[in-house]
Amino acid sequence: MTIKVVTFDLDDTLWPLRETILAAHKSANDFLASQVPSVKEILSTNKEREVWGQLIEKDPTMRHRLSELRFNVFKNILQSLGQTEQQAEKLSSEALQIFMNGRHQLTLFDGVEEVLAQLKEKYTLGVLTNGNADIKRLGIDHYFNFSFSAEELNDSKPSATHFKKAMEFTSEKAASICHIGDHTECDVEGALNAGCKAIWYNELN
């Protein structure tokens, strides 16, 4: 069947993520430490990772909502250090905003915009991501006809939910959709299991 729709993963497919996330994480943590000095010692241990795991264990669906999860990690740690709920929520909101600002300081892989522009002339383009990047904020939304994230769907690839939403939005059958992504399980296996075609693309490997 002819390909009519091409969907893309975002992180590590259209841009490298690791260094950006590390820098964003450091900026948020530095802010919290400037407001509550005792948080610095906590953040230098595995406490943050432990809280992350505890929150997911309590509500497994939160793994799909990364912004909410990060906010609650900040809030939990701050309250454990004696901050009131109101104080913790205020600081957590500010820290999350700092993180998200840093998270969007991204540089596309070479040639990405040229490829998207060429593909848009022939195919319906979409985004299927497990992350929380905002393509409008990044200034690349004009290349895409639709975008679905794990936060929006409350589910993550390799579940079929993302791919079914693409079919629903475009009114196309799975075999007419080709998904491109860097992750062999989430992107390739997820797409194939949903009946779509898949291309594994990993600029870093």
Positions of PLM-derived features:
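Asp-based, Mg2+/Mn2+-dependent phosphohydrolase catalytic module
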Residues: 1-6, 18-19, 34, 86-88, ...
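N-terminal helical cap/lid subdomain that shapes the substrate entry/recognition surface
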Residues: 2-110
